[in-house]
Structures are given as structure tokens and as C-alpha cells.
Amino acid sequence: GKIYEQCELAREFKRHGMDGYHGYSLGDWVCTAKHESNFNTAATNYNRGDQSTDYGILQINSRWWCNDGKTPKAKNACGIECSELLKADITAAVNCAKRIVRDPNGMGAWVAWTKYCKGKDVSQWIKGCKL
């Protein structure tokens, strides 16, 4: 995995076409990544309730989005192995996140976005970054 610097991650998200994707700004994505994983691509968190695991910089869940071979009734809507989401290269995580925000909930799929980023001035997350 890799722990990104804030502006470095903003540049990566921008390079992957996330600025304005489905109406969400770069600040929304950087804010969400900060509160989900502290910018760490290797982050994992197990959810005892449904026995799923959240993976990577955006903490994408194995119940719906990726396959880890151990989550009951998993859907794998992104069609990827969860291990792809832990790589230093965030391409797989970004592509899956794009799939997730196309759902009616949008970024509401991320608890951290709803709690810490929604309705806030998220431009502060990219302030001073050379983008």
C-alpha cells in the first residue's frame, strides 16, 4: 500500500477524472479519503455485523462492491478482487468509486462523506495544492 500526501492524492484524483464527476468536487473525494482511511491505501476494517470488510483509501465494502472470497452473500458490483483496492496505484479504487456514485445515493454511500464533508466547504481540502 501507500500513504498519500493530501495534495498528491488530490492530483491523482484529478488525473483520474474525479473533479466534478457526477457533481462531486475534488474536495469531496479528498475529504472522504481523509476520514475513511487517513489517505492509506492499505487500510482495512472488518464489520462484524454483516461480516464484510472495507478496503483501501476509500474503504470500499466487500458486501456490495468487491470479492474477497469470505464475505457472505457478496455482490461484487465492481467486478474486482478486494485486494486490488489496497494497491499503491488507486486506479481500481477510483473506477469502483465512480461506479458507486452512479447509484441514487451518490456519495451518501460513504458514512464519512455524509458526516464530515457533505454541506461543508470542502475546497479547503485542495487549498494550496498545485492542481
Swiss-Prot record:
Q: What other note does the entry give for this protein?
A: Lysozyme C is capable of both hydrolysis and transglycosylation; it also shows a slight esterase activity. It acts rapidly on both peptide-substituted and unsubstituted peptidoglycan, and slowly on chitin oligosaccharides.
* EC class of the enzyme, as a word: hydrolase
Which cysteine pairs are joined by S-S bonds? 7-129, 31-117, 66-82, 78-96
- GO molecular function (one): lysozyme activity
Protein species of origin: Pelodiscus sinensis
Fetch the SMART domains from UniProt. Answer: LYZ1 (SM00263)
Which reactions fall under this protein's catalytic activity? Hydrolysis of (1->4)-beta-linkages between N-acetylmuramic acid and N-acetyl-D-glucosamine residues in a peptidoglycan and between N-acetyl-D-glucosamine residues in chitodextrins
pH-dependent activity: Optimum pH is 6.0.
- Which keywords fit this entry according to its UniProt record? Antimicrobial, Bacteriolytic enzyme, Disulfide bond, Glycosidase, Hydrolase, Secreted
InterPro entries to which the protein is assigned, alphabetical: Glyco_hydro_22, Glyco_hydro_22_CS, Glyco_hydro_22_lys, Lysozyme-like_dom_sf
Q: What family does this belong to?
A: Belongs to the glycosyl hydrolase 22 family.
Q: What does this protein do?
A: Lysozymes have primarily a bacteriolytic function; those in tissues and body fluids are associated with the monocyte-macrophage system and enhance the activity of immunoagents. Has strong bacteriolytic activity against M.luteus and V.cholerae, weak bacteriolytic activity against P.aeruginosa and no activity against A.hydrophila.
Q: Which residues form the active site?
A: 36, 54
Q: What is this protein called?
A: Lysozyme C
Lineage top rank: taxon: Eukaryota
Coarsely, its chief localization is secreted
Q: Pfam families, per this entry? A: Lys
* Complex and partners: Monomer.
Tell me where it resides. Answer: Secreted
Instruction: Give the EC number(s) listed in the UniProt record.
Output: 3.2.1.17
Q: Which GO terms describe its cellular component?
A: extracellular region
Keyword Lipid metabolism included in the entry's annotation: no
Q: Which GO terms describe its biological process?
A: defense response to Gram-negative bacterium; defense response to Gram-positive bacterium; killing of cells of another organism
Please explain, per the UniProt entry, the way this protein's activity relates to temperature.
Optimum temperature is 40 degrees Celsius. Activity rapidly decreases within 30 minutes of incubation at 90 degrees Celsius.
Domain (C-type lysozyme) ranges = 2-131
